[in-house]
Amino acid sequence: MNENTKVIKGRTGDWEMVLGLEVHAQVASKSKLFSGAAVGFGAGPNEQVSLVDAAMPGMLPVLNRFCVEQAVKTGLGLRAQINLKSRFDRKNYFYPDLPQGYQISQFDQPIVGEGVVSVERDDGTTFDVRIERLHLEQDAGKSLHDQDPNATYVDLNRAGTALMEIVSKPDMRTSEEAAAYVKKLRTILVYLGTCDGDMEKGNLRADVNVSVCRPGDYEKFRATGDFKHLGTRCEIKNVNSYRYIQQAIEYEARRQIEILEDGGKVDQETRLFDPTKGETRSMRSKEEAHDYRYFPDPDLLPLVLDPAWVKSIEETLPELPDAKKARLQSQYGLSAYDAGVLIIDADRADYFEAAAKGRDAKLVANWVTNELLAKLSAAGTEFTNSPLPHTDIAQLVELIENGTISSKIAKEVFEHMWAGEGRPAEIVEKRGLVQINDTGAIEKAIDDLIAGNPDKAEAVKDKPQALGWFVGQVMKATGGKANPGTVNELLRKKLGVE
């Protein structure tokens, strides 16, 4: 058993969970997978529907080349095998928001094969999640049940939108690992520009496969590849937040354990997560591939990719999160933690690098990942919309470096910057916050303090830790403007503290 595997205590012994995810990522494209209809969030019902999307008679699908390029780019970003020949199939099922009566997907010949995603846990350790495949498919429309008590309305704006379904192997063993995997996958997709990763809008959602087994059984499965060593899995559909992913997994694992410990049998089924109640509920029995009667779509030729075209896409890939993190650590001397915080968002990392030019990079990272990030998070905004340009953070750090202000005063200056009072240097001048570096002025404050506290001055020789009180009093006397390093140095000299 891996030391990171979570053991769940049951009445009849220990259990472990086994998790695999199918992540549906909406392709960042201006038009749909097989039609020229626009893709956008917030349009009125059925405003972005073509005759192809509505499955009108005689309308034929035409493959969107850009969506194929986005899928290839994603596959390369996942270190996956790009299949030069793939095929589109019809997945047959009936639902009101699927006007064709089938979904165009990819069954046994997907565009992308096996890959891998390296994921970091909260404690800094890493694990790999193997990618089984990535395939392109159409999204369905949306059924609206709350518009009329006697009817269901259908909005086909989403119908035909391109999705990438990214299927993982069952390599995750805790709910925290599953959430961390989705976070990392989202970061990669956003870096690549192939999906905007907005989970609130449904552009990234996960189907979570959960099963439980006894300790040691998972290792047997990994050694043999035989699923008989694992329990029956249930799929939780369309979970669209990291927190809900964790909650759904924890509840479902407990539910399955209770059934098994009561002597029952877990049914393979599709379930939904109810975030209000924090529980999963049955949706339908889980279908197998043969239930969908897959067959090649006769309206679409096999998809054959030119190796040179794939190579040209690979050459345009941006620097991805893992490579960027390693570079930030080596180039700027950042800690793994700070680099990890910065690379969560490419714009965040770019902001840091722009601010760090010619400055103390570690100090810049500290301001970006702490004060600025906290303010942006509280305001619910991102670095792209930061009211403080990177030049302001760079100037603030410069004022600290050249001794114009102390780190303590810098925090006060930062608050005024955030309030929109101007650039750092202007605020320092306007508010008279320049640090006192004049040793004469500092010595006078120290002499006055010692003269007024002779007993404490004598006692500090035996209790050097009491020096902090003197430092605090001098800083207070100078309005926090005295250079802390100079204060410390002069106090030690005058009080005879080594």
Curated annotation (Swiss-Prot):
Report the protein's function. Allows the formation of correctly charged Asn-tRNA(Asn) or Gln-tRNA(Gln) through the transamidation of misacylated Asp-tRNA(Asn) or Glu-tRNA(Gln) in organisms which lack either or both of asparaginyl-tRNA or glutaminyl-tRNA synthetases. The reaction takes place in the presence of glutamine and ATP through an activated phospho-Asp-tRNA(Asn) or phospho-Glu-tRNA(Gln).
- Protein EC: 6.3.5.-
Q: Which GO terms describe its biological process?
A: glutaminyl-tRNAGln biosynthesis via transamidation; translation
Question: PROSITE patterns from the xrefs?
Answer: GATB
Assembly description: Heterotrimer of A, B and C subunits.
Catalytic class of the enzyme = ligase
Read off the SMART domains from this record: GatB_Yqey
Q: Which GO terms describe its molecular function?
A: asparaginyl-tRNA synthase (glutamine-hydrolyzing) activity; ATP binding; glutaminyl-tRNA synthase (glutamine-hydrolyzing) activity
The alphabetical list of record keywords is: ATP-binding, Ligase, Nucleotide-binding, Protein biosynthesis
Which NCBIfam families does the protein's record reference? gatB, PRK05477.1-2, PRK05477.1-4, PRK05477.1-5
Q: What does the record give as the reaction this protein catalyses?
A: L-glutamyl-tRNA(Gln) + L-glutamine + ATP + H2O = L-glutaminyl-tRNA(Gln) + L-glutamate + ADP + phosphate + H(+); L-aspartyl-tRNA(Asn) + L-glutamine + ATP + H2O = L-asparaginyl-tRNA(Asn) + L-glutamate + ADP + phosphate + 2 H(+)
Q: Which domain of life is it from?
A: Bacteria
What family, per the record? Belongs to the GatB/GatE family. GatB subfamily.
Q: What is this protein called?
A: Aspartyl/glutamyl-tRNA(Asn/Gln) amidotransferase subunit B
